[in-house]
Amino acid sequence: YVDPDEDTLGRMQQLKLEEQEKKELLQTLKGRENITIDGKKIMLYANIGNSKDLAAVLQNDAGGIGLFRSEFIYLERDTFPTEEEQFQIYRTVAETMAGKPVIIRTLDIGADKKCDYFEMEPEENPAMGCRAIRICLTRPEIFKTQLRALFRASAFGNISIMYPMIISVDELRKIKTIVAEIRQELTEQGVTFGEPKQGIMIETPAAVMMSEELAKEVDFFSIGTNDLTQYTLAIDRQNPKLDAFYDPHHPAVLRMIQMVVENAHK
C-alpha cells in the first residue's frame, strides 16, 4: 500500500503485532524436543536462499537445512556462476552446519523465477513450461557445472542433492548418466569429492502416481506442497483472485501426500 487509509493501516499494524507475538512464542520453545500431538518426534529444518541466511539458522537452533534454494545463486547476479564460485558457497554452508543435514536443490529456474542471462524464450504458461529439471536436462552444460560443485562440496559436510520437478523414471536415469560422467571426470582429474545422497521433490500429480517406482531410484523424497497443491487443484497460486480456492488441506492433496508416504516406505 502506497498511501493506506486508517483502517488498512490499523489492520497492518495488528498483523505486525501478531507476527511479533508468534516469533516471541517460538523463541520460548527453542531447544525443546519437537514432538507432535500423537507422540511422534520430528526434526525441524530451515529453508535458505543463500549463505547469508546461516546466522538465523544457527541462532534458531535448526536441526539442519531442509531446502537450500540454489537458484538464488543465479538470480542474484548477471552472469552464470562458475563451478568454483558455487563450490565455495556450498562448502561454506556444509562446514558451517558442522555435520547437520544440508539438502541442496538443484537449479529451479523458470515459472515465477526468471533470469535474463539464461535467454529463455517467453512462454504463455511458464508454470507448465521449461523449468527446473527440464532446463537442466536440455542445457546440460549448466547442470554439469552445478553438479561438479555439489559433489566436490559434499566432501566437506553432510550434503544431499535434490532434483526438482521430476515426473518420470526416465528423467532420473538421464540424471544418473550425467552423474556417472561427473564422477568419472572428477576421479580422472584427481579431484576430491563425496558421495551425497540423491533425492527428488514430489510436486506434481504425475510424480505422486509414479512415486512407488521413483522411490526405487532415489534415496529420499521431499514433498513440495505449494506446487503439488497448484497442479492438483488446477489453481494458479500466483493469482490473488484464486486465494480462496487455494487449499493445501484439500482432501485430494492430503490423499496424494498419504500415497507418497506409503509408497516411499514400501
Place the predicted regions along the sequence by residue.
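Conserved alpha/beta-domain cores
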Residues: 24-266
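Conserved glycine-bearing catalytic or ligand-binding loops at nucleotide- and phosphate-handling centers
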Residues: 1-14
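Phosphate-binding P-loop/Walker A region and its immediate neighborhood
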Residues: 16-19
